[in-house]
Amino acid sequence: MKTLLLLRHAKASRDDPELDDRDRPLKPRGKEDAKRLGRRLRVAGVVPTLIVSSTALRARKTASKVAKHMNYARAIELNPRLYLSSPNDHVEVVRSVSDAEDRVMIVGHNPGLSQFLSELADIEAELATCDLAQIELPFNHWAELGKSACAKLIQVWHAGDRD
Protein backbone atom coordinates (compact mmCIF):
# COMPACT_ATOMS: atom_id res chain seq x y z
CA MET A 1 0.00 0.00 0.00
CA LYS A 2 1.28 3.48 -0.92
CA THR A 3 0.20 6.86 0.42
CA LEU A 4 0.03 9.96 -1.74
CA LEU A 5 -0.21 13.45 -0.25
CA LEU A 6 -1.42 16.08 -2.73
CA LEU A 7 -0.70 19.61 -1.51
CA ARG A 8 -1.82 22.75 -3.30
CA HIS A 9 0.61 25.62 -2.76
CA ALA A 10 -0.20 28.18 -0.05
CA LYS A 11 -1.75 31.61 -0.70
CA ALA A 12 0.45 33.59 -3.09
CA SER A 13 0.69 37.29 -3.84
CA ARG A 14 -0.51 38.96 -7.03
CA ASP A 15 0.64 42.40 -5.86
CA ASP A 16 3.38 42.86 -8.47
CA PRO A 17 1.91 42.66 -12.00
CA GLU A 18 5.45 42.70 -13.43
CA LEU A 19 6.34 39.36 -11.85
CA ASP A 20 6.21 36.26 -13.98
CA ASP A 21 3.59 33.83 -12.66
CA ARG A 22 6.33 31.34 -11.71
CA ASP A 23 7.94 33.95 -9.45
CA ARG A 24 4.95 34.89 -7.28
CA PRO A 25 5.89 34.80 -3.56
CA LEU A 26 3.75 33.59 -0.69
CA LYS A 27 1.61 36.07 1.21
CA PRO A 28 2.14 36.24 4.99
CA ARG A 29 -1.05 34.20 5.44
CA GLY A 30 0.33 31.57 3.06
CA LYS A 31 3.54 31.30 5.07
CA GLU A 32 1.59 30.84 8.30
CA ASP A 33 -0.75 28.28 6.75
CA ALA A 34 2.22 26.24 5.49
CA LYS A 35 3.89 26.30 8.91
CA ARG A 36 0.66 25.27 10.64
CA LEU A 37 0.06 22.43 8.19
CA GLY A 38 3.60 21.14 8.67
CA ARG A 39 3.17 21.08 12.45
CA ARG A 40 -0.20 19.31 12.19
CA LEU A 41 1.21 16.66 9.85
CA ARG A 42 4.18 16.07 12.18
CA VAL A 43 1.92 15.64 15.23
CA ALA A 44 -0.34 13.25 13.28
CA GLY A 45 2.65 11.23 12.04
CA VAL A 46 1.83 11.97 8.41
CA VAL A 47 5.33 12.81 7.21
CA PRO A 48 6.31 11.85 3.66
CA THR A 49 9.40 9.88 2.75
CA LEU A 50 9.72 12.08 -0.36
CA ILE A 51 8.51 15.55 -1.37
CA VAL A 52 8.30 16.50 -5.05
CA SER A 53 7.41 20.12 -5.84
CA SER A 54 6.61 22.26 -8.82
CA THR A 55 9.42 24.65 -9.71
CA ALA A 56 7.20 27.73 -9.22
CA LEU A 57 8.36 29.87 -6.28
CA ARG A 58 5.06 29.65 -4.39
CA ALA A 59 5.11 25.84 -4.55
CA ARG A 60 8.79 25.62 -3.58
CA LYS A 61 8.29 27.93 -0.60
CA THR A 62 5.18 26.05 0.49
CA ALA A 63 7.07 22.76 0.29
CA SER A 64 10.05 24.10 2.26
CA LYS A 65 7.91 25.64 5.02
CA VAL A 66 5.77 22.53 5.42
CA ALA A 67 8.90 20.34 5.36
CA LYS A 68 10.69 22.42 7.99
CA HIS A 69 7.77 22.32 10.41
CA MET A 70 7.19 18.57 10.10
CA ASN A 71 10.93 17.87 10.54
CA TYR A 72 11.39 16.47 7.03
CA ALA A 73 15.17 16.28 6.64
CA ARG A 74 15.69 15.27 3.00
CA ALA A 75 16.09 17.50 -0.02
CA ILE A 76 12.90 18.46 -1.83
CA GLU A 77 12.86 17.27 -5.42
CA LEU A 78 11.83 19.88 -7.98
CA ASN A 79 9.97 18.82 -11.09
CA PRO A 80 9.08 21.40 -13.77
CA ARG A 81 6.40 19.05 -15.06
CA LEU A 82 4.26 19.93 -12.03
CA TYR A 83 3.82 23.57 -13.14
CA LEU A 84 0.60 24.07 -15.15
CA SER A 85 0.24 20.30 -15.16
CA SER A 86 -2.52 18.03 -16.32
CA PRO A 87 -3.71 14.94 -14.44
CA ASN A 88 -1.63 12.87 -16.87
CA ASP A 89 1.50 14.88 -15.96
CA HIS A 90 0.86 14.04 -12.30
CA VAL A 91 0.47 10.36 -13.15
CA GLU A 92 3.82 10.35 -14.95
CA VAL A 93 5.60 12.15 -12.10
CA VAL A 94 4.22 9.71 -9.51
CA ARG A 95 4.95 6.66 -11.66
CA SER A 96 8.62 7.70 -11.81
CA VAL A 97 9.02 7.60 -8.01
CA SER A 98 11.18 4.83 -6.55
CA ASP A 99 9.25 2.02 -4.88
CA ALA A 100 11.47 2.56 -1.82
CA GLU A 101 9.28 5.61 -1.08
CA ASP A 102 6.06 4.66 0.69
CA ARG A 103 4.54 8.09 1.36
CA VAL A 104 5.04 10.78 -1.29
CA MET A 105 3.97 14.42 -1.18
CA ILE A 106 3.33 16.27 -4.45
CA VAL A 107 3.20 20.08 -4.19
CA GLY A 108 1.49 21.70 -7.13
CA HIS A 109 -1.23 23.88 -8.58
CA ASN A 110 -4.85 23.94 -9.58
CA PRO A 111 -6.64 23.11 -11.71
CA GLY A 112 -4.42 20.09 -12.50
CA LEU A 113 -3.88 18.95 -8.92
CA SER A 114 -7.59 18.94 -8.05
CA GLN A 115 -8.42 17.25 -11.35
CA PHE A 116 -5.84 14.56 -10.60
CA LEU A 117 -7.36 13.99 -7.14
CA SER A 118 -10.87 13.88 -8.61
CA GLU A 119 -9.89 11.24 -11.14
CA LEU A 120 -7.87 9.13 -8.69
CA ALA A 121 -10.48 9.02 -5.94
CA ASP A 122 -13.59 9.30 -8.15
CA ILE A 123 -14.82 12.38 -6.29
CA GLU A 124 -15.48 16.04 -7.06
CA ALA A 125 -12.47 17.79 -5.53
CA GLU A 126 -11.38 21.41 -5.40
CA LEU A 127 -8.35 21.93 -3.20
CA ALA A 128 -8.07 25.43 -1.74
CA THR A 129 -4.67 27.00 -1.15
CA CYS A 130 -2.58 24.96 1.30
CA ASP A 131 -5.12 22.11 1.39
CA LEU A 132 -3.64 18.62 1.43
CA ALA A 133 -5.42 15.45 0.34
CA GLN A 134 -4.18 12.22 1.93
CA ILE A 135 -5.00 9.21 -0.23
CA GLU A 136 -4.17 5.51 -0.11
CA LEU A 137 -3.31 3.56 -3.23
CA PRO A 138 -3.99 -0.21 -3.36
CA PHE A 139 -0.62 -1.30 -4.71
CA ASN A 140 3.08 -1.49 -3.83
CA HIS A 141 4.63 -0.13 -7.02
CA TRP A 142 4.20 3.50 -8.08
CA ALA A 143 4.42 2.43 -11.72
CA GLU A 144 1.03 0.72 -11.32
CA LEU A 145 -0.69 4.09 -11.00
CA GLY A 146 -3.13 4.82 -13.78
CA LYS A 147 -5.35 7.82 -14.33
CA SER A 148 -8.55 5.98 -13.48
CA ALA A 149 -10.12 5.86 -10.03
CA CYS A 150 -8.19 3.57 -7.72
CA ALA A 151 -7.49 5.63 -4.62
CA LYS A 152 -9.19 5.92 -1.26
CA LEU A 153 -9.42 9.45 0.13
CA ILE A 154 -8.39 9.28 3.79
CA GLN A 155 -8.54 12.93 4.77
CA VAL A 156 -8.35 16.48 3.46
CA TRP A 157 -6.26 18.73 5.67
CA HIS A 158 -7.50 22.34 5.38
CA ALA A 159 -5.15 25.25 5.92
CA GLY A 160 -7.71 27.11 8.00
CA ASP A 161 -8.14 24.28 10.50
CA ARG A 162 -6.56 25.02 13.86
CA ASP A 163 -4.05 22.88 15.71
Specify the residue positions occupied by each region the protein language model found.
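Glycine-rich phosphate-binding loop signature in dinucleotide/nucleotide-binding domains
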Residues: 44-46, 97-102
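Active-site-proximal alpha-helix that buttresses catalytic centers in soluble enzyme cores
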Residues: 3, 7-80, 85, 89, ...
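Domain-level recognition of soluble alpha/beta enzyme cores
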Residues: 123-154, 158
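Active-site catalytic microenvironments for nucleophilic, acid-base chemistry
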Residues: 40, 65, 69, 96, ...
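A glycine-rich beta-strand to alpha-helix segment
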Residues: 102-119
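Conserved ATP-dependent adenylate/AMP-binding module captured primarily in the ANL superfamily
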Residues: 90-94
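Residues that scaffold the ATP/ADP-binding catalytic core of kinase and kinase-like folds
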Residues: 16, 116, 145
